């Protein structure tokens, strides 16, 4: 075990931050360290916290961390939300709440959006989760904003997803729920002291009852919270625990771990295979002809891709 | 030229809708038709309209269509936004405004979110744009929500991106601009009759002046609009025209077309190569051993992927 990997296994947060930065930059040295850490991963309970901007995810997260710490659990946070407190975009109150946690050795918070590059977020996020997992954090929360490809990919890689919404968000944001509805294991109606909170709960319940899917055994709870003063946070943590227990008892906890590793592996194969295929092509006249025909629209991209892939052979 | 492709080239909207549905379902028949259409693409001016939910993109879009039609341009719309009017999540006023357009032969609007599947949106979106391009629409607008991998990929594939924001959106949404700032060619401050509009314009101008990038020749304009009654829409369409002219004069219009085709081709190669690699592996004992070691964490996903990719050979 090399020095950096050892430090990270011992919980050294500076070493972990250095490694995550290497991984963000796709540095081979980072991958080498992550390989050494890998056998020590697979123990964390991984949560997703998602919802549109402005619903109070950051404030809720600050209180969630407090409650997890009360229960003697170490908490890691990977914030994929560009508006998360770490990146400086949040309200002063959240920054103060978070500062309390940053002085706690049992809490480690990393934002994946500070470097300004948005591409490849889901890959780097998964790598950061592996690092925090190896460090021994019991609970890892991935905070994402909105709904899109990133969120769906992140949801596929966590054990439990909580979707946060608000009363009175207006038609446009209500419509987003159609996408978020599919990925939620737990639903949170925040700012539940505002008018219309019970209406949102009723609407969600109705939509959830109509939701079709193979996983009919788990009935997603809808938790009302007032994040600003911590109301409902204990109930929310209880709901996370209940879902974890459900996953363990049904064997789905291990299934999701296996599926996550397999998908990550498959994604790596895709990227490495593409690099290998394209790296060796530039000097070949046949490839240059193909690209010329593509650019001049003499050949369509599907036919061009089929031509190239036809020449690929794979043995193991 | 087969029947379906011919109908689409003649502008038949029902045939186009059928084809886009086939492409959403990844049906080989859809790809065959798209191949036939491909030589007829590459003529449209492709715009991206993006911003957080609630900023009034749909209302703005309805007025934009009217103004483009005034200028005798045929307009296609691909709405990647789940809250777009087509999917039924929008305000009644927008639906009425859109209905007027749906009865106009020179307008074609497709939503990519009605089917409820969120994965692979950016690929299907590009395919839908190709279909509309082949149909002869002069302007194609891609409407997306929020900021994420999808938006960045969409921004990479359009000629001109307009980013819409609002006065007084609060800290959290302001922070999102950091991501949106990078991809905007034109910025729109909608609801500019609300207090604080000039402050947002000033902030944006300041942030844009600090924006670093190779493309220093184009100074992104900031347009104030009141979408609900169409104020500023003429100026916005003028800004789109000015950016188009800038792209054409500097050769960037063709460059972006070429880059878009190349990236689409590269993406297809990645997907087809992965399918080819994995399709033939399941029966191989060596592969099954590799997966067993992966699942039991005896081998890490990087090493497993390297092992597999090592055996790939590519000739053309």
Which residues are covered by each model-predicted region?
Chain A
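Alpha-helical scaffold elements adjacent to nucleotide-binding pockets in ATP/GTP-utilizing enzyme cores
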Residues: 91, 128, 153, 157, ...
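Canonical P-loop GTPase G-domain recognition
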Residues: 186, 192-249
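Nucleotide-state-sensitive switch-loop elements of NTP-binding domains
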Residues: 3-47, 55, 64-150, 157-164, ...
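Hydrophobic positions on the alpha1 helix immediately C-terminal to the Walker A/P-loop
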Residues: 60
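Long, well-ordered amphipathic alpha-helical subdomains in the mid-to-C-terminal portions
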Residues: 224, 235-312
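P-loop (Walker A) phosphate-binding loop of NTP-binding proteins
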Residues: 52
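Short hinge/gating elements
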Residues: 2-5, 112, 187-189, 221-226, ...
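Conserved Switch II/interswitch segment of TRAFAC-class P-loop GTPases
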Residues: 156-174, 185, 189-198
